[in-house]
Amino acid sequence: MTMPSTANGGFPSVVVTAVTATTSISPDIESTWKGLLAGESGIHVLEDEYITKWDLPVKIGGHLKEPVDSHMSRLDLRRMSYVQRMSKLLSGRLWESTGSPEVDPDRFTVVVGTGLGGAERIVESYDLMNAGGPRKVSPLAVQMIMPNGAAATVGLQLGACAGVMTPVSACSSGSEAIAHAWRQIIMGDADVAVCGGVEGPIEALPIAAFSMMRAMSTRNDDPEGASRPFDKNRDGFVFGEAGALMLIETEEHAKARGAKPLARLLGAGITSDAFHMVAPAADGVRAGRAMTRSLELAGLSAKDVDHVNAHGTATPIGDSAEANAIRVAGCEQAAVYAPKSALGHSIGAVGALESVLTVLALRDGVIPPTLNYQTPDPEIDLDIVAGEPRYGDYRYAINNSFGFGGHNVALAFGRY
């Protein structure tokens, strides 16, 4: 029995027709892309009051170039969590960029992942209750705290009735959202989907928590050089704020409305390590299986893969495990790019952001340079794109996302 795939017509052809993002380099995706190609970094010294108040060991990160709240009304600020406000902003931009199309609500789905959701509202509500009792807690607290609030905001704003979902799978949440949206479409439950990931701002508690795990870089005197994916001297990740969404739909639906596809979404693989709560399995076997599964569903072989957009957090164990995963999947010939070297780590949003960058690499036939890759690690024998952008005839690419809890997600994209 032949395994169904996109290539053999077993699944409908799914295309990406619009993308949007806000990052520490620029509030729009095209300017972010140009900045990455030019070797820009969004990582700087943090000047927030909490850095000195708590004398945090990490004093660097990447705040959004343009604050989300500068686009919000007083009512939005009062009734929405931060991730809900980000979702509202990005979904509005995405929909406008695609011409605000008329779609059948019953064939329209939304999947938006996040790592923590509206966690800041839990702290605020607790402080209010501590100071004045339960009556001080807002009746809007529940809708702001619930992790599915960001996806629900998009579903309400755009009128999606084919399901609204919220993957909460740590650093793979954004990619898993795209995977589930693709599944909704190929299973016949939807024709079009808004999908991606959002995350809250850099705050003191996440810095403290991840620092205590020794997962973060402490190169405070060299912020732009701190995130060093796959480099022998890497010492941890750096936070970088971001959010990203994309519009995917069947090729038939896109053609019917006159949309111009940016790329194809060919397959999605999801596995889990069943190894450790926060450490990846060093052998990369299950992560590599996610990559292989995405290719099987796409109808591709490992040798077809021209480019891997790596999860590449710059942690010693994480990058080694990913290198092993790429070898397990047989994709070691692919040109590898690690965007966190320039943009930092945005947790629940990062998989979506890096998926968008993968789409743009295929669209333009160019891969940005991985910053700070200076001393190759002999244990990581990969073709890391560094120094300058690399132009080429890129047909197929995989985006990797791996998260605490042993979550592994790989998305296979193709040039349109």
Curated annotation (Swiss-Prot):
Ketosynthase family 3 (KS3) domain location: 11-415
UniProt signal peptide: none
Pathway: Lipid metabolism; mycolic acid biosynthesis
Annotated keywords: Acyltransferase, Cytoplasm, Fatty acid biosynthesis, Fatty acid metabolism, Lipid biosynthesis, Lipid metabolism, Transferase
GO CC term, one of those recorded: cytosol
Homology family: Belongs to the thiolase-like superfamily. Beta-ketoacyl-ACP synthases family.
Subcellular location: Cytoplasm
Catalytic EC class: transferase
Keyword DNA damage: no
Keyword Zinc: no
Top-level taxon of the source organism: Bacteria
Family matches, as NCBIfam families: PRK07314.1 (NF005589), PRK07910.1 (NF005916)
Residues annotated as binding substrate: H311, H345
Gene: kasA
Enzymatic reactions: an ultra-long-chain mono-unsaturated fatty acyl-[ACP] + malonyl-[ACP] + H(+) = a 3-oxo-ultra-long-chain mono-unsaturated fatty acyl-[ACP] + holo-[ACP] + CO2
Record's protein name: 3-oxoacyl-[acyl-carrier-protein] synthase 1
Described purpose of this protein according to its UniProt entry: Part of the mycobacterial fatty acid elongation system FAS-II, which is involved in mycolic acid biosynthesis. Catalyzes the elongation of long chain acyl-ACP substrates by the addition of two carbons from malonyl-ACP to an acyl acceptor. Involved in the initial extension of the mycolate chain and forms monounsaturated fatty acids that averaged 40 carbons in length.
GO molecular function: 3-oxoacyl-[acyl-carrier-protein] synthase activity
Active site: C171, H311, H345
